[in-house]
Amino acid sequence: MFSGAGRPSKEQIKQYDNLAVGEMKKGASVAAVLLLTPFVISFFQKMRA
């Protein structure tokens, strides 16, 4: 993951942290949408019934 020998610089660490946080937020929102979809569909079906 890190290029070159030795410890990564603080800037690199910050970059990777931001990337990881962004990916986690993306994953969490996708998971939330997938979890909520059945409830939303059944809600609209009840409204139309």
UniProtKB/Swiss-Prot annotation:
The gene is tom5. It comes from the Eukaryota. Component of the TOM (translocase of outer membrane) receptor complex responsible for the recognition and translocation of cytosolically synthesized mitochondrial preproteins. Residues 1-26 are cytoplasmic. The chain crosses the membrane at residues 27-44. Its main location: mitochondrion. InterPro entries: Tom5 (IPR019603). One of its GO terms (cellular component) is mitochondrial outer membrane translocase complex. GO terms for biological process: protein import into mitochondrial matrix; protein targeting to mitochondrion. Forms part of the TOM (translocase of outer membrane) complex. It is found in: Mitochondrion outer membrane. It is a single-pass membrane protein. The keyword Transmembrane applies. This is Mitochondrial import receptor subunit tom5. It holds the Pfam family Tom5. Keywords: Membrane, Mitochondrion, Mitochondrion outer membrane, Protein transport, Signal-anchor, Transmembrane, Transmembrane helix, Transport. Belongs to the Tom5 family.
